[in-house]
Regions:
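An N-terminally biased module of ancient metal coordination in phosphate/nucleic-acid-related enzymes
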Residues: 1-78, 90, 94, 152-154, ...
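Residues at alpha-helix caps and immediate loop-helix transition turns in enzyme cores, especially N-
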Residues: 15-18, 80-83, 195-199
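A short acidic, amphipathic alpha-helical/loop segment
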Residues: 21, 83-87, 201-205
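Short hydrophobic "helix-edge" motifs at membrane interfaces and signal-peptide entry regions
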Residues: 27, 135-136, 208-210
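Hydrophobic residues within beta-strands of alpha/beta enzymes
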Residues: 33-35, 96, 143, 183, ...
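Short glycine-/acidic-enriched loop or helix-start segments at secondary-structure transitions
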Residues: 45, 107-108, 194, 226
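Extended substrate/RNA-proximal surfaces in nucleic-acid metabolism proteins
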Residues: 47-178
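Active-site-adjacent C-terminal substructures of enzyme catalytic domains
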Residues: 163-226
Length: 226
């Protein structure tokens, strides 16, 4: 069965999706679903993008089945390695996404995109932080939405081009592969022709380096996007 392994319910600050609606869409589309609510311990706004894990399991455990899984999306930063490891280790998650939502301590969506970097600087700093995080963390199964900043940056061409960032992408992918981690194929921007082409090149590099598997995730925050 194919799983949509990246979606957010009411336990995420930026979503109010009801798990029952997500389950219904999964049944309608004949796919499995994995709930992966946000846990960004280093998020600059106190209490946002964090949730009470015991309450999450107390409320959702009754829905767990062969095609409904309970996961988490952990924001990877160099400042929260031990705390992130503890969350992943101490709770019975079926699946853990690792994500880069901040660069140089700045939230990508709120602050980082407004720092005035040119495209080369913008993505180089992003990938440098990503490489450090995947080297330091062992708590995740799949690295999510590698093109996340492309949603918000404002360059003439927002896409990640392998020709521009091949060396550091190769370091990241080799680290993932050597650790037994995989890369997520995030579907949120695949409808954009330029994104589709750029992502094909990125995943070809991943495959050429020995990557055998991907997880598929919509990053849905509402049932319509599953």
């Amino acid at each position: 069965m194919i799983f949509d392994s990246h979606m957010h319910s009411k336990f995420s600050t930026d979503s109010n999706m009801n798990i029952l609606d997500a389950i219904a869409v999964g049944k309608e589309k004949n796919i499995g679903i994995i709930i992966t609510d946000h846990m960004d311990l280093d998020y600059p706004v106190k209490d946002e993008f964090k949730f009470d894990v015991p309450t999450y399991f107390n409320e959702y455990e009754k829905y767990r089945s062969s095609n409904v899984k309970l996961g988490i999306e952990i924001g990877l930063t160099t400042n929260t390695v031990s705390e992130n490891e503890a969350i992943a280790k101490n709770y019975d998650f079926d699946f853990v996404l690792g994500s880069i939502h901040a660069v140089k301590g700045l939230d990508i969506y709120v602050d980082y995109v407004h720092q005035g970097y040119n495209k080369k600087q913008f993505f180089t700093y992003y990938f440098e932080d990503m490489l450090k995080c995947v080297q330091l963390h062992d708590n995740f199964d799949s690295l999510s939405h590698i093109d996340y900043p492309c949603r918000y940056c404002k360059f003439d061409n927002n896409e990640i081009l392998v020709s521009e960032f091949k060396d550091i992408l190769a370091e990241i992918f080799t680290t993932l592969i050597n650790k037994g981690k995989v890369l997520e194929l995030n579907t949120a921007r695949l409808h954009v022709p330029e994104s589709n082409k750029a992502m094909r090149d990125i995943y070809k590099l991943y495959m050429d380096l020995g990557g055998k598997y991907v997880t598929i995730g919509s990053d849905a925050h509402s049932p319509l996007n599953i």
